[in-house]
Amino acid sequence: MSAAKEQLLAAQETQMTLIEKDSTDLKDHIDSWGPVRREHGLLYAARHKGLIWLGLNPVPPCSVKCLEARQAIEMQLLGNSLKESPWCNEPWSLCDLSWGRYQAPPAETLKKGARLVEVEYDGSSTNKTWYTAWNSLYLRKPDEEGWETATGGADADGLFYTTMSGTRVYYELFERDAARYSTTGTWTVRDNDRTYHSHSAPSHSRETIEGLWNSGGRERGRPTNSPDRAVLHTPPGGNTVHGPVRACENRGRSINRPTPYSTPQSPRSGVGPDTTSPLPSPVPQNPRCVSLPDGFGRGEEDNPPSPDQHDVIPNPQPKEPRFSLFGSSGGLPCLLISGTGNQVKCYSFRVKRWHRDKYHHCTTTWWAVGEQGSERPGDATVIVTFKDQSQRSMFLQQVPLPPGMSAHGVTMTVDF
């Protein structure tokens, strides 16, 4: 299995090099999926032979590696196909050709230029949610080889993209979420500097929403001059793609969603009732609840202080001592652990997780600075510090060093 370990290490090292390159060239991202596929294939073969570890890497079940290997193959073939299209020379980031973005709504499309679309229900500033819209989308042509581009947008109905032929395809409908989280069936959409208001309150008794479907799982859109009827998008698996995750699905309780940015608390003109105005309260039935003049029949015991009236001061946490390589007057015992970038990063992760009590501090992975660009001459290195010589000796005895790595003991002293 030594050959398999070397091949796995080489595949992981190639992946790290391409990730740190931060390239915008499509060819580099196509090449990055090759070592990913080899890594999953090696781990699949290792698990098939009954191994649960391959070097320092745990071996997942065969079903997991088989699925991830197929995903890598699909993305590599997708990139090779895109390389033959007119958009091959555009700047492409590693995220643009990632599996997660490829499967994000609308599924099985490449996307660029994400932006947030805010939807406010019932005119309430506390009843909001956000969706992700895309400026540009790239789709495989269903009936012929090749690619076509589309522009993303949003309106009062939902999120959509418009193809080169003028067909508008909706992949997210706000009406469905309004039926669950809105009491009046109205909402306001804000997309950058554009604002849209919902149409008349939808009928929630309708069981289905009309749509056009084809056998490939991708919906057929409608021309832009056709009547407003949204097309519901369903991925090939059959499960309807929902919008963002919501923290509460009970409309009887207040809905507080985390905001991706700070919003002013001033009232806005929106559709629906004004939720900021207080509602008239019923006449209390308990005589103790009747408002009395100040100083009449009230004592200090009747009005206990509210927690909101006092500042909560947390107990101060003791500050950890600041890390320094030269903190010890007699010299700080250290170890210089060197190897390839992947080896050193895996090693530092492992000792931090399983042997944290056996050393004092550990630095991040570092290299020497090259003469040009992002060149990194020499091996990757981490510095592990210890409180005294005995702790370092015990660390060397109890923590094994993987093959191919080296450890050098040094003592940090200050000359001036």
UniProtKB/Swiss-Prot annotation:
Cysteines engaged in disulfide bonds, as pairs: none
Cellular location(s): Host nucleus
Keywords on record: Activator, DNA replication, DNA-binding, Early protein, Host nucleus, Phosphoprotein, Repressor, Transcription, Transcription regulation
Annotated SUPFAM superfamilies: E2 regulatory, transactivation domain, Viral DNA-binding domain
Region annotated Disordered, chain positions: 190-321
PTM note: Phosphorylated.
Region (Transactivation domain): 1-203
Gene Ontology terms describing biological process: DNA replication; DNA-templated transcription; regulation of DNA replication; viral DNA genome replication
A GO term from the CC aspect: host cell nucleus
Region (DNA-binding domain): 333-416
GO molecular function: DNA binding; DNA-binding transcription factor activity; nucleotide binding
Ranges annotated as biased composition (Polar residues): 256-278
Its biological purpose: Plays a role in the initiation of viral DNA replication. A dimer of E2 interacts with a dimer of E1 in order to improve specificity of E1 DNA binding activity. Once the complex recognizes and binds DNA at specific sites, the E2 dimer is removed from DNA. E2 also regulates viral transcription through binding to the E2RE response element (5'-ACCNNNNNNGGT-3') present in multiple copies in the regulatory regions of the viral genome. Activates or represses transcription depending on E2RE's position with regards to proximal promoter elements including the TATA-box.
Family according to the record: Belongs to the papillomaviridae E2 protein family.
Assembly and binders: Binds DNA as homodimer. Interacts with protein E1; this interaction greatly increases E1 DNA-binding activity. Interacts with protein L1; this interaction enhances E2-dependent replication and transcription activation. Interacts with protein L2; this interaction inhibits E2 transcriptional activity but not DNA replication function E2. Interacts with protein E7; this interaction inhibits E7 oncogenic activity. Interacts with host TAF1; this interaction modulates E2-dependent transcriptional regulation. Interacts with host BRD4; this interaction mediates E2 transcriptional activation function.
HAMAP family (alphabetical): PPV_E2 (MF_04001)
UniProt name for this protein: Regulatory protein E2
